[in-house]
Amino acid sequence: NQDAAFERVYRRLYKVQYPLDRVGRQRLEKVRPTLQRYAEQIELDWLNLAALAFKESTLNPAARGAGGATGLMQVTPATARAMGVSNIHQLDNNVQASAKYLANIRRNFFASPRLNERERMAFILAAYNLGPQRVQSMRAEARRRGLNPDQWFFQVERIAMETVGMGVVAYVNSVNKYYLAYQRERYLLEADRKTAAN
């Protein structure tokens, strides 16, 4: 049964690293002001940006990835240039380029009022990972197959799994898990900032 196989793989993919161990908390505290500043500029919960950064680099601003992906947000030089940002080896510029790209994806591809915020964020994450045009193609294929093109979970993600494999499905799921872990401890993560402001 294809649905049962999908469920087994889906459950296995939910096993992710805990982002709030001692090292994770220390790294988050160092980059938090930058994440908060740029998340606020694009009207995004900073914990979404933090969860994405944890997935991309385990909050390591010096990370280097495939295809020239660089820094905390694993931004490529081409993406940064397209967003009008240079020197992505610098933390501030890296996060700025990523935030601008996320805002661009949201505005140009996933602004429809038909999308609820949870689904919108899932599509934005998938597009950050694969590119927005590929995700839009998957939505069109979902529509052709009678699936809901405005729902990532259990709908468009099925098309993604068939066409590009489990990588993007695992990616979106992991970022969501990290976000939930951060969200659960939001009060503690933001307490230092509130204390410092007083």
List PLM regions with ranges.
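Catalytic glycan-binding domains that act on GlcNAc-containing polysaccharides
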Residues: 2-198
